Swiss-Prot record:
Residues that hold GTP according to the record: 587-594, 633-637, 687-690
Source species of the chain: Nitratidesulfovibrio vulgaris (strain DP4)
Stretches of the chain forming a coiled coil according to its record: none
Region called G2, residue ranges: 612-616
Gene it is expressed from: infB
NCBIfam families xref list: IF-2, small_GTP
Xref: PROSITE patterns: G_TR_2 (PS51722), IF2 (PS01176)
Compositionally biased region (Basic residues): 473-482
Amino acid composition bias (Gly residues), ranges on this chain: 419-429
Protein name: Translation initiation factor IF-2
Gene Ontology CC terms: cytosol
Start and end residues of each tr-type G domain: 578-745
Region G1: start-end pairs: 587-594
Annotated function: One of the essential components for the initiation of protein synthesis. Protects formylmethionyl-tRNA from spontaneous hydrolysis and promotes its binding to the 30S ribosomal subunits. Also involved in the hydrolysis of GTP during the formation of the 70S ribosomal complex.
Location of the protein in the cell: Cytoplasm
């Protein structure tokens, strides 16, 4: 340690924290410190101390947060209660002044009571959101003394014009004799409601008029109706619940002066109609029908002349649709004889806003009210003249805005043949609806071909109510005809400008959803460089771009595997347990990775590998004195790049093995890059320290150039010097791994569905598809359903790395799983799911997507791909291959290595590749495509061999990857094996033979021509016939070994495994020269 650096353990002791806590702080600050002996730069110390102190202060502050939340909740309640007490006297005082305008009183009572008019139609989602807070009891509040005249408020509804269908009574402002002082909102199931969107009632106060109150009629108190805001409703309810004495007195006064007509609109709640109410409605409807057929007078009282009728609101309270004196008036039932509107008859001389309507005029049935904004109680049109009536008011009011709300288009019509109260009935059933029969045809003419038509069906949420459907036709004759509602042709509203797309959508379907013509979308696609037809499928990304051009949003619908595979919530800290570290051993080929693992496992894996090199990725669970460790052994050969990358991605720690006598090699650099890309910490093990030429300093120097600086040199990379052969330094290496794992705090939740990655996959002849799975979280049990890549399955059996059968596997446990539907790709994520149906659904969805991606790649034709397909016949030399390997990872490595061998003159085309034994279908495929079958660690059956001979298919077998690559290179040189040429060197004549014990016969020769070399091949000729062909074992001149003997000299020559040498034989020397066929 230098003067300007401090060790981690010393700083931890100084700050009074554990090394583990300090390690976490350093990790958050991106200060590299792997062990407690790591050093920290002096300039970093102030920042670290500030961070540790800030964390202590932050922990102290967090402890008080829950109390603050609780206290805030109490303050809200107190404030609401105080506000309620303060408002009651003000409201009474305000109500005592009759000349004060109602808007001012409403603002003084509670300013949020007056809501802004809604500018756009509400969706059902908005209605539900508004409806939810109304489930709590809502207390009615009296804001004036009973002896004062009631302020008259204008009610603007956000609902369509109603039929006399059953409707939920609003919450009463006054309390009936049988009810409690404040009536709460009933549950939805108990309300006889029309099946329509629930909308909040919004009240706009109007100017009071003393003349509006008739003599002899005591009016009930009228309440300013609050908008249905959840926060305000809850606050008011809390304030009343706290016990407001003044409110209690007002409620008692209210009980004495009960008026059955006065109701307070609070909110309309949708529910199914009550069967008892429906039966009563049907009876009343039949009576009304009989009266209408008889042409009788419709009771209800004659409207006084010139009565003041502020729009929608009568003096004395609110009159919802279908509500008449005496309570609920369902479905066109007659009003009791002599009945009157709740607010009383209109006195003479009253003012009705609007221009005077001509005497005797009437508003024909079915005439739509003009769209537009009505403000301030103004009613366009004219007051109905004396004795006038509105016959057959069955036309729906078109969509239009009134202040305080809106009336959606297509609302239910008013009951046919029902004149306004005070009017006189016309013909039975009223006058027929002009144009009612032709509205459907008219709306069809208005439809534009390129615009979306929105039809609100009769049985939909805005059509006939449920009790209308139960009643059936409403009459006979012309009245019996079904109501024909116009189909509104309109572009989608802004809130509805969304199209729903699955993984892909056709151009025609997209045009239909957007209300456009298909050629408009095709025009945009052409501008994007996509040649599309009306039936072309667009992926979701392209559809999003196209929809954006027209101002639409894309909503992805359909099956989503994320709903099943993505964890719903994070694991709670108390559910996490410590898991063993996953350590990947990486390095260059022949640097001793597997031998080092053998020494740790005390086994012999290397002996089982062909050629002594690792060609699979192996997972091993090792129990050491320092705890359990999971090792992944990766291949070092250059062809296994993908395997090394995969090993780095699913590991916690990488041990980089470098031979002390060899130094840093190409695959060593690649392993370092893979580990850095995966963000995995690296520990270096310098192996082969027992060799004479070991030079660990050279390794440290070369690795420092790659960014791995040893701790001895002031860096943070841990170096361990080991020898797999002598087991030197293994305990130190295991201890360093255990310390590093402790710093990383590796934890996982074992009590959840298993999730992991496939390390290796293969096809076993007896057990079917197998995969080595490293479980990373959860516990995998026998019988669990799972999905992996495009395959689903159920765990039939599990085996550990020793081949023993196990029932379950926890986090950081490698197991071999049996039960796949096919051979999965190595590196795929393995996820356990609830049942087989979900697994199969996800697998099928992935398979369809994969096929679509493959088809999309094939359909894309560029200039380069087009020209590459038109090579000349002389140059179009292609080597077709069918690759079969034992495991999926090896197949991937071989495929990649073989593809790299392609040159401009010879292309390699892999017709098919798969894991498992060579089958009959492989032979037939190779025969049809003139391909060579390459088998790696697999063998065919005798039947398959016979078929191969019949089909003249060449099968090559390999067990070492670099031999496979070399032979393919040779085959590419001339589409055949390398050419070997024999070169003549010289001749020697045998003049004498000598028999040497333990060696054999030695020929004494004289070189007659050329020369004879020691490594040359020889051919023994006797009377011109070749008797022996072999090699020279010894070549001596006198007693000295020589490399060659020139012409004219004598020598002694021994032949390999041949002693029948006779005087007079001729020995011809030659050598074989390999020459690759030129292309």
């Amino acid at each position: 340690m230098t003067e300007n650096k401090t060790k981690v353990k010393d700083l931890a002791a100084e700050l009074g924290v554990t090394t583990k806590e300090l390690g976490q702080v350093l990790k958050d600050m991106n200060i590299s410190a792997k062990t407690s002996t790591s050093v920290i730069a002096q300039e970093d110390l102030p920042r670290i101390k500030e961070r540790v102190q800030a964390q202590r202060d932050g922990g102290a502050r967090k402890e008080g947060n829950p109390d603050v939340i609780v206290r805030r909740r109490h303050r809200d309640g107190d404030r609401a209660s105080a506000r309620a007490e303060a408002k009651a006297p003000e409201q009474e005082a305000t109500a005592a002044m009759p000349e004060t305008s109602a808007p001012e009183r409403a603002e003084e009572a509670d300013k949020p009571a007056v809501a802004k008019p809604a500018k756009a139609p509400e969706t059902e989602a908005h209605a539900r959101a508004r409806k939810e807070p109304q489930a709590e009891p809502v207390k009615a509040r009296i804001i004036r003394r009973p002896d004062e005249p009631a302020p008259v408020a204008k009610v603007v509804e956000a609902a369509p014009a109603e039929t006399p269908a059953p409707e939920a009574p609003a919450v009463k402002a006054t309390v009936t004799a049988e009810a409690a002082p404040a009536k709460t909102v009933e549950p939805e199931s108990e309300r006889p409601q029309a099946d329509k969107p629930a909308t909040a009632r919004v009240v706009r106060p109007a100017t009071p008029d003393a003349s509006a109150v008739p003599d002899g009629t005591s009016s009930a108190p009228t309440l300013p109706v609050r908008s249905a805001e959840p926060s305000d409703t809850v606050e008011r309810a809390d304030a009343d619940a706290d016990g407001d004495d003044d409110d209690a007195q007002q409620r008692r006064r209210k009980k004495k002066r009960r008026q059955p007509e006065a109701v307070v609109p609070q909110v309309r709640v949708i529910s199914r109609p009550d069967p008892a109410a429906v039966a009563q409605q049907q009876m009343q409807q039949q009576a009304a029908q009989q009266q209408r057929e008889a042409g009788g007078y419709r009771p209800g009282g004659q409207r006084p002349e010139g009565g003041y009728r502020p729009e929608g609101q009568r003096e004395g309270g609110y009159r919802p649709e279908g509500q008449r004196e005496g309570g609920y008036r369902p479905g066109g039932a007659p009003r009791p004889e002599g009945g009157y509107r709740p607010g009383g008859p209109r006195p003479e001389g009253g003012y009705r806003p609007g221009a005077p309507r001509p005497e005797g005029g009437y508003r024909p049935a079915g005439g739509p009210r003009p769209e537009g904004q009505r403000e301030g109680g103004y009613r366009p049109g004219a007051p109905r003249p004396e004795g006038g009536y509105r016959p057959a008011g069955g036309a729906p009011r078109p969509e239009g805005q009134r202040e305080g709300g809106y009336r959606p288009a297509g609302g239910p019509p008013r009951p046919g043949g029902a004149p306004r109260p005070g009017g006189f009935g016309g013909a039975p059933g009223g006058m027929p609806v002009p144009g009612a029969d032709g509205r459907g045809d008219q709306s069809k003419k208005k439809r534009q071909k390129g615009r979306r038509t929105v039809d609100f069906q009769a049985d939909g949420p805005r059509g006939r109510s449920d009790d209308d459907v139960m009643r059936g036709p409403r009459g006979r004759g012309k009245r019996g005809k079904k109501d024909v509602r116009p189909a509104a042709t309109q572009p989608l509203k802004a809130i509805k400008r969304k199209i729903k797309v699955d993984e892909a959508i056709r151009v025609a379907d997209m045009a239909h959803q957007m209300g456009l013509k298909a050629n408009e979308i095709i025009k945009v696609l052409f501008g994007l460089g996509v040649m599309a037809t009306i039936n072309q499928s667009l992926d979701i990304d392209t559809a999003t771009v196209v929809a954006g051009e027209f101002g639409y949003e894309v909503e992805k619908v359909g099956f989503s595997e994320d709903d099943y595979l993505v964890p719903k919530e994070e694991d709670a800290p108390e559910t996490l347990v410590t898991r063993p570290p996953v350590v990947t051993i990486m390095g260059h080929v022949d640097h001793g990775k597997t031998s080092l693992l053998d020494a740790i496992r005390k086994s012999n894996v290397t002996a089982g590998e062909a050629g002594g090199i690792t060609q699979h990725i192996g997972a091993y669970h090792v129990t050491t004195k320092k705890g359990e460790i999971v090792f992944l052994d990766t291949p070092g050969h250059e062809a296994f790049t993908a395997m090394r990358a995969r090993g780095a991605q699913i590991t916690d720690l990488v041990v980089l093995v470098v031979a002390a006598d060899d130094g840093v090699m190409e695959q060593t650099r690649e392993a370092v890059n893979h580990s850095k890309a995966a963000g995995v910490p690296i520990m270096v093990a310098v192996n082969k320290m027992d060799k004479e030429g070991a030079n660990p300093d050279r390794v440290i120097r070369e690795l420092s150039e790659l960014g791995l600086v040893a701790e001895d040199w002031g860096g943070d990379t841990i170096f361990a010097k080991v020898s797999a052969k002598t087991r030197e330094g293994l305990d130190e290496l295991l201890e360093l791994i255990a310390i590093q794992a402790e710093i990383l705090e590796l934890k996982a939740n074992p009590d959840k569905a298993a999730r992991g990655h496939v390390v290796e996959a293969k096809l076993d002849k007896g057990r079917g598809p197998l995969a080595t799975v490293l479980v990373q979280e959860g516990t995998l049990r026998q019988g669990d359903a799972f999905v992996c890549g495009v395959f689903a399955g159920r765990v039939r059996a599990m085996f550990d790395d020793q081949g023993r059968k196990v029932k379950e596997a926890g986090p950081s446990t490698p197991v071999e799983v049996q039960g796949f539907d096919g051979v999965v790709e190595a590196g795929e994520e393995f996820v356990s799911v609830a049942d087989d149906k979900v697994a199969r659904r996800i697998a099928e969805s992935r398979a369809v997507k994969q096929r679509e991606r493959e088809l999309a790649k094939e359909s894309k034709v560029t200039l380069e791909t087009f020209l590459s397909r038109r090579a000349d016949a002389a140059e179009a030399l292609t080597l077709n291959l069918v690759l079969k390997a034992d495991v999926q990872g090896t197949l991937e490595a071989i495929s990649e290595a073989v593809r790299k061998l392609s040159t401009e003159k010879v292309k390699i085309n892999i017709i098919h590749g798969g894991a498992g034994a060579i089958t009959e279908s492989d032979i037939l495929l190779a025969s049809a495509s003139d391909a060579i079958i390459i088998g790696f660690n697999v063998r065919p059956t005798s039947k398959v061999k016979d078929i191969a001979e019949q089909e003249n298919v060449d099968i090559r077998f390999y067990d070492i990857i670099y031999k496979l690559v070399d032979e393919i290179k040779s085959a590419m040189a001339g589409m055949l094996a390398p050419v070997q040429r024999e070169v003549y060197l010289g001749q020697a004549e045998v003049r004498e033979t000598f028999s040497v014990p333990k060696i054999g016969v030695i020929a004494g020769c004289h070189v007659a021509d050329g020369k004879v070399t020691r490594n040359a091949g020889v051919r023994l000729l006797r009377d011109g016939v070749v008797v022996y062909t072999g090699k020279i074992t010894s070549l001596k001149r006198f007693k000295d070994d020589v490399r060659d003997v020139q012409k004219g000299y004598e020598c002694g020559m021994g032949l390999e495994n041949f002693n029948d040498i006779k005087v007079g034989d001729v020995i011809e020397a030659f050598e074989m020269v390999e020459e690759a066929a030129t292309l």
